[in-house]
Amino acid sequence: RRWPRSRSRCSPGDPPTMKLPRYRTGDPALDDEVAALVERVATPTDADLVFELVASSLRLARDRADRGDLKIANAALKEMRHAFGVFAPYRAARKVAIFGSARTQPDDPLYLQTTELAAAVAARDWMVVTGGGPGIMEAGIEGAGPDNAFGVSIQLPFETATSQFIAGDPKLMNFRYFFTRKLEFIKESDAFVLLPGGYGTLDEAFELLTLLQTGKAQPAPVVLLDVPGGTYWEHWGAFVDRELELPGYVSPEDHHLMRVTDTVDGAVDEIFGFYSNYHSQRFVEGWLVLRMQQTPDAAGVAALNEEFADIVARDAIEVIDATPAEVADDDHVELARLAFRFDRHGWSRLRMMINRLNGRSEQ
């Protein structure tokens, strides 16, 4: 136990009681002052992290960091703090992020495709996250309705118009930096749909796939959506096959991180099929714990061990109860579980395993 339970707050003038983390300001007297301040506002559970946040700010000052660097750190932290607060009341709601061109016009078939998709996911009590601007972003908000939508906007010298459907809504956030904006998109979303767009859309597509491929984002369905007869993702996929996969820059298994479709039904099937059995995952003491509605029977577990032995670092895939850490956190203890020593490398293969757990064939 790290924190004293006798009290959770410290009054002004009281000596600090918290155990200091290893990361400090470098000045013992200043550390004590920071600790006393932190104990006045932070919960005992999170006091160490709040201490380190303050310590980082003070270390930047002691480093005599350039004012421009301080502005970046300051703005980024303020943007994240605000966004965390906006999303916090909706953490229990599943969300789909929708990316695409700001230049798509309301009479474009892609616009209608997007409104239909957003309406379909909202009808299943999901929310949508878009960039809050015109084009595909506005189509997503219009389809879902503003009550079911977030706007994660970026400040630009052009294409800055806010969608009429979310203007003035408290769920509209404005970001200065792309990196903090993309962090919120990926952190808060449970599924991703990308429609044709420009450099920004392709940037979002490649960064998202990179994060999934390297395990820096939670496994999630990714849909590359076009209209019937459209060639955008077809040509993009041909480029990936020819220029990335053929020379060995990406693996054939990486195709399983995404699905290309030209229908709303196909997109909906991919999103909700991903969560038809699988729920979530968590690492606990070196074990990857997969949570789901129902685990396979003994024969099914044996089949998983045979098919996915290449991503099991040691031991085997097995059915387990909720771990003590999950019980302590009340972390979906009602769900069934599989656990194994994941090699932390084969993330695309892990996605293939999730498909198996959902009873879905490879596409």
Describe the function of each predicted region.
Residues 19-154, 331-335, 358, 363:
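Glycine-rich beta-alpha loop segments
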Residues 34-42, 288-301:
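Charged/polar low-complexity intrinsically disordered segments, enriched in acidic residues
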Residues 112-114, 135-196:
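Acidic/glycine-enriched connector segments
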Residues 125, 149-160, 195-196, 209-236, ...:
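Short, acidic/small-residue loops that bind anionic groups at enzyme active sites
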Residues 172-180, 257-267:
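Short acidic-hydrophobic, aromatic-tinged amphipathic segments that line or gate anion-handling sites
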Residues 175-225:
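Active-site/ligand-binding-proximal alpha/beta "capping" segment
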Residues 183-194, 243-262:
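Conserved thiamine diphosphate
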Residues 289-295, 302-363:
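N-terminal accessory interaction module
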